[in-house]
Regions:
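Ribonuclease/tRNase effector modules and their secretory precursors
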Residues: 2-130
Length: 130
């Protein structure tokens, strides 16, 4: 069955999409010594209708690329357990992240904990504009 543009546009992201996004992110962040990980909660929230407009694959790919280009080195300076919120003002996307050292691995984990589309998101954590 061929999907209409509207069906394609409103389609939820699935496990394959997240696997592709993680591979895309890892290809970029690997040189910074970071392994990008999406939590189950993050994946659930991407498809949450409370975000208003659905968070699209392209938005996530753009967010990851902009994060790498604009803030990759800033993220590497976060301490073990350090938290921050990636904020993309153009799309109102907010992504709380945590950096975790892995003693048995050469890379640290950059854990994307959740995502929400909210204009005036407030946090006590460091905000990183991307």
């Amino acid at each position: 069955m061929i999907k209409t543009f509207s069906q394609w546009l409103n389609e939820e992201l699935d496990a394959r999409d997240f696997k592709d996004l993680e591979r895309f992110a890892d290809d970029h962040f690997e040189e910074l010594g970071l392994d990008v990980v999406f939590t189950k909660h993050f994946k659930d929230q991407v498809n949450n209708p409370r975000n208003g407009a659905a968070v699209t694959y392209d938005e996530l790919e753009n967010l990851l690329l902009r994060t790498y280009n604009a803030a990759g080195h800033k993220i590497t300076k976060l301490p073990d357990g350090g938290e921050a919120v990636l904020k993309q003002l153009a799309t109102w996307l907010n992504v709380p992240v945590k950096v975790i050292d892995q003693p048995d691995q050469p890379e640290r984990e950059l854990v994307l904990k959740t995502i929400m589309r909210k204009r005036h998101f407030e946090t006590p954590n460091q905000e990183i504009l991307v």
